[in-house]
């Protein structure tokens, strides 16, 4: 009776009752943060999950299973991405095992082949295959390079805080622009939605996040 009120069954990627469509990612992140300590503590379990997750992601991108759910939204098909970031950190700090390093390199090579052969040549892909593969192929070397540089750039913290707020509020910016009828030009729409999303994110940081961080810091002193 009470459990059904706490569970959302995902039957649509754009449900009419969803005020913040990207909020599904919070669920995936919470699950990942529960799983990561276990998967990183037990290395062989982590590597097994890493490969199983990538296989699920691949099956989704071939449209064998639901490409949107299992290749983009739900934890079984994306936990390998979280593990990729963790393995990058371990590689840079010299704590990664040879199997962890090799697995990350192999998956990167497979993903590069996938992009060239299946997407560019064959034109075969599922929902968000292009976006997630491109993010993976650009993100892994970029994050590795930034971790190796170990240099703190100006505005790093601010941009880091803004990024997730922009992601969560970008639909709001689309709806505002649609309401005021400013969606005719795609370039101006992208520019304006970025400004609106960044402004909303900055307000949330200033009015809520910074105050919560201050309270949290005082509690842990």
Curated annotation (Swiss-Prot):
It holds the Pfam family Acyl_transf_3. The lineage of its organism: Bacteria, Pseudomonadati, Aquificota, Aquificia, Aquificales. InterPro entries: Acyl_transf_3_dom. It comes from Aquifex aeolicus (strain VF5). GO terms for molecular function: acyltransferase activity, transferring groups other than amino-acyl groups. It is a multi-pass membrane protein. This is Uncharacterized protein aq_1078. GO terms for cellular component: plasma membrane. Keywords: Cell membrane, Membrane, Transmembrane, Transmembrane helix. It is found in: Cell membrane. The chain crosses the membrane at residues 33-55, 70-92, 99-121, 125-147, 154-176, 186-208. The keyword Transcription regulation does not apply.
């Amino acid at each position: 009776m009470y459990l059904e009120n706490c569970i959302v069954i995902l039957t649509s990627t754009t449900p009419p009752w969803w005020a913040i469509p990207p909020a599904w990612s919070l669920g995936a992140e919470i699950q990942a943060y529960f799983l990561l300590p276990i998967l990183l503590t037990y290395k062989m379990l982590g590597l097994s999950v890493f490969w199983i997750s990538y296989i699920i992601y691949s099956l989704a991108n071939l449209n064998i299973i639901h490409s949107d759910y299992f290749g983009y939204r739900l934890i079984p098909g994306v936990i390998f991405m979280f593990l990729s970031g963790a393995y990058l950190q371990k590689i840079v700090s010299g704590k990664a095992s040879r199997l962890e390093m090799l697995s990350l390199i192999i998956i990167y090579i497979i993903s590069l082949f996938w992009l060239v052969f299946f997407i560019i040549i064959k034109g075969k892909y599922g929902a968000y295959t292009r976006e997630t593969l491109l993010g993976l192929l650009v993100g892994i070397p970029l994050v590795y390079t930034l971790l190796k540089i170990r240099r703190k750039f100006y505005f790093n913290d601010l941009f880091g805080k803004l990024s997730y707020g922009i992601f969560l509020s970008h639909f709001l910016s689309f709806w505002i622009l649609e309401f005021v009828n400013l969606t005719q030009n795609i370039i101006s729409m992208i520019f304006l939605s970025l400004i609106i999303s960044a402004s909303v994110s900055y307000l949330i940081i200033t009015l809520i996040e910074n105050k919560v961080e201050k309270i949290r810091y005082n509690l842990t002193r």
